[in-house]
Structure formats: C-alpha cells, structure tokens
A protein has these predicted regions:
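Catalytic phosphate/metal-binding cores of nucleic-acid and nucleotide-processing enzymes, i.e., regions
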Residues: 1-145
Length: 145
C-alpha cells in the first residue's frame, strides 16, 4: 500500500529560553490519498491518535485533504548551526533513541520531526507506543512517503 503524505509549507521559528533553543513550527501536510492514509493509520492506531489529537483537518474545494498542526520542540544544542534542520534528531540523540526515529523516518518521512517535537514533553511515556507503531509498519510492509 502506498500513501501520499507530503509537506507543502513549513515555518520554523527559534527562540532562546533558559539557555535552550525552543523550536516552534507550523506545518501543513497534503494527504494525496485520504482513504489510504486512514487505512494506514488503522494499522497503527497509536500514531493515528497522536496525530489526530494535535491537528486540524480540512478539505479544499477540490477535495484535497490537509492536516495543519503546530509543534514545539526543545533542542539542547546551544548553537543553531549544530541543529539538524531537515529532521532534527538532537532530542532523540540526547535521549539515546535515535534509532527509533530513524526507523520511523523510513515510513513517516516528513512527520518524523513532527512526532518528536509535538510530543517532546511526554515523549518518554509515548516512546514504547511509537516504537510499536514503527514495528507495525514493518510487519505490514507499509510504505508512506
């Protein structure tokens, strides 16, 4: 099963707070295959529930569906040039969980950093669930890109 999931707009705003870089982002995702995405998230309800809890969903006049969400993340890097702009694994690295996000990236691509940023505050509580979802993708040979 292939599901289209792609970013078409993203704003990243950084500010310093208590010596840490706060990353605020607002992103919009275009869902090319709404039914396929729904089926995909039925296989991985943990991830589906995480996403639906933090987004607004709408369709334009052409029936194209979008997810709009905002995320907040904390980078423990003191210098912006050490922060990985593309994915942003710094938090994962400090938590020794980079491989979890690497595995997720194979299937969630653009929303990998969304999962990391939005759920930073309770990431450790959710980590097992996210890991289970990644393995569920592996089991079903799901290809989201």
């Amino acid at each position: 099963m292939k599901t289209g999931l792609r970013f078409f707009d993203r704003n990243v705003i950084r500010k310093e707070e208590n010596g840490m870089t706060i990353v605020l982002q607002k992103a919009c995702v275009c869902i090319d295959d709404v039914e396929g995405l729904s089926n995909a998230f039925n296989l991985i309800p943990a991830v589906r529930s995480l996403i639906t809890a933090h987004n607004s969903y709408y369709e334009d006049e052409n029936g194209v569906a979008y997810l709009v969400f905002e995320g907040k993340g904390i980078s423990r890097c003191n210098h912006e040039d050490t922060y990985d702009e593309k994915i942003g694994f710094r938090i994962a690295e400090t938590r020794a969980q980079k491989d979890v996000f690497n595995k997720a990236a194979k299937f969630f691509n653009g929303i990998t950093y969304f999962i990391e940023k939005v759920f930073y505050d309770d990431l450790m509580d959710k980590l097992t669930t996210i890991t289970d979802a990644v393995y569920a993708c592996n089991d079903h040979e799901l290809d989201i890109k």
